[in-house]
């Protein structure tokens, strides 16, 4: 049989500016992008409707739910230890792969808990899933520290914003498909069998994410003449005022986000009665599509205009969304308001995340860089994420429940505890955007002027 050659040649997609980079460097940067794409599906399962439905199916209250979803960010404090271990051992690749595989593979037994602990022992079930969550979260902190340290060394500074935008775009596209598949599986396989399957899928895809790093070329960590003690490392970080200003803003901004973030899904699932597929389409796929459209634009804007003005603009625009949630009550307007909030979330918040990540990479010096990243992540996740989740759950089960009993009318329905939580979120978001961020920008400008004299 004669084979005809068409002369057509297929080029691989160019995801970022490869100018001046050798083939090995380009390949490593590409592998990191494809790795996070697999990881995104894992994150969508373990942090989306599957986790919400699974925990609620186990019968947890809003307060306990808030505590459980806070386990992962609360483990951020372990990053200080992880950074110390990394700086002392200098074995970045081994730390990343070992901790990553452990944290991802634990999702398999996590989803199987209802099959080997009977319904007659609900407390044992809760304690066991808490244990799996805690061990997975703690091992993830070693992964995060080594991964962020790798990014700071392997991504050229001139393309840092656009590269992170391209990485986010690819992972988001994959996440859209994964999110829809997860919701579809949960709807056709209801109950604990469906949850066991999707958490097993999370373990598999999360492990694929980590195994790709075997082929990544890890640049050597910077050589230090003397290894600092943990006390000296911490002291160095805590005397950097510009760095601490960034940490303070991102922490309070994160608190305003995560105070109500896990309860949006609870609210529309219980109060509005949407299916898993409908929730995933609206709460994950729709904002992800918007993120794909905007990510490279935000990345390019960060490279062209700088981090501070872009973050300031995003903060002001996104501070409106929680007010719309306040008016989401059972009725004809609820779907339209939910669509608007998730569209704005997808368009704006990824830009803020890229901006914060670029800022922390730029503001952490090469010496003891992983400790800077550890302190940043520890504070922002422990206070801005974990504490916010727990406080949100406590507010819902206590003072806001009392307000709900007043049955204040709104748009033909009565305000419930979730509406009040969304109103508090709106107030905090505006404080962050209009008071704290401008002060941080002003302080940075004063420091820059002083250094230029």
Enumerate the predicted regions with their spans.
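Hydrophobic core of transmembrane alpha-helices in multi-pass small-molecule transporters
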Residues: 37, 106-107, 113, 121-143, ...
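Helix-loop boundary and gating motifs at the non-cytosolic
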Residues: 2-79, 83-86, 93-97, 103-111, ...
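C-terminal transmembrane helical hairpin of 12-TM major facilitator-type secondary transporters
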Residues: 309-353
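Transmembrane alpha-helix termini and helix-breaking/packing motifs in multi-pass membrane transporters
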Residues: 52-53, 57, 84-88, 111-120, ...
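Cytoplasmic membrane-interface "Motif A"-like loop-to-helix N-cap segments
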Residues: 88-105, 166, 191-193, 304-317
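Intracellular loop-helix junctions on the cytosolic face of multi-pass helical membrane proteins
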Residues: 1-30, 114, 120-130, 134, ...
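Helix-to-loop junctions at the C-terminal end of transmembrane segments
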Residues: 78-91, 186-187, 293-307, 396
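C-terminal ends and interior cores of transmembrane alpha-helices
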Residues: 100-122, 187-188, 316-333
């Amino acid at each position: 049989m004669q084979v005809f050659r068409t002369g057509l040649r297929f080029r691989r997609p160019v995801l970022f500016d490869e100018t001046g980079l050798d083939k090995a460097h380009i390949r490593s940067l590409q592998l990191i992008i494809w790795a996070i794409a697999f990881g995104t599906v894992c994150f969508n399962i373990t942090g989306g409707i599957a986790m919400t439905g699974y925990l609620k199916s186990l019968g947890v209250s809003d307060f306990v739910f808030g505590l459980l979803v806070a386990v992962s960010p609360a483990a951020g404090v372990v990053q200080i230890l992880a950074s110390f271990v990394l700086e002392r051992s200098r074995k970045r690749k081994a730390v990343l792969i070992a901790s990553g595989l452990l944290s991802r593979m634990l999702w398999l037994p996590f989803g199987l808990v209802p099959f080997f602990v009977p319904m007659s022992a609900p407390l044992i079930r809760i304690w066991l899933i808490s244990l799996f969550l805690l061990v997975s979260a703690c091992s993830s902190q070693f992964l995060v520290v080594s991964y962020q340290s790798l990014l700071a060394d392997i991504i050229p500074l001139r393309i840092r914003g656009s590269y992170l935008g391209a990485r986010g775009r690819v992972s988001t596209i994959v996440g859209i498909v994964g999110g829809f598949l997860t919701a579809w599986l949960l709807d056709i396989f209801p109950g604990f069998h469906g949850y066991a399957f999707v958490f097993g899928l999370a373990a598999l895809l999360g492990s694929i994410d980590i195994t790709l790093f075997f082929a990544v070329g890890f640049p050597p960590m910077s050589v230090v003449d003397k290894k600092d003690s943990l006390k000296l490392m911490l002291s160095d970080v805590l005397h950097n005022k510009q760095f601490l200003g960034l940490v303070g803003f991102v922490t309070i901004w994160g608190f305003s986000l995560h105070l109500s973030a896990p309860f949006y899904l609870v609210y529309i699932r219980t109060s509005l009665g949407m299916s898993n597929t409908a929730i995933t389409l609206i709460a994950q796929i729709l904002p992800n599509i918007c993120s794909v459209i905007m990510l490279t634009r935000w990345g390019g804007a960060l490279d062209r205009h700088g981090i501070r003005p872009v973050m300031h603009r995003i903060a002001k625009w996104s501070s409106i969304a929680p007010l719309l949630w306040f008016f989401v009550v059972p009725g004809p307007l609820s779907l339209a308001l939910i669509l608007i909030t998730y569209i704005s979330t997808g368009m704006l918040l990824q830009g803020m995340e890229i901006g914060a990540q670029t800022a922390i990479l730029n503001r952490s010096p090469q010496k003891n860089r992983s400790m800077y990243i550890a302190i940043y992540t520890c504070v922002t996740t422990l206070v801005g994420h974990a504490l916010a989740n727990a406080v949100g759950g406590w507010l819902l089960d206590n003072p806001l429940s009392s307000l709900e009993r007043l049955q204040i009318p709104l748009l033909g329905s009565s305000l419930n505890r979730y509406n009040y939580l969304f109103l508090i979120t709106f107030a905090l978001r505006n404080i962050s955007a209009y008071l704290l961020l401008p002060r941080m920008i002003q302080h940075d400008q004063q420091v820059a002027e002083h250094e230029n004299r």
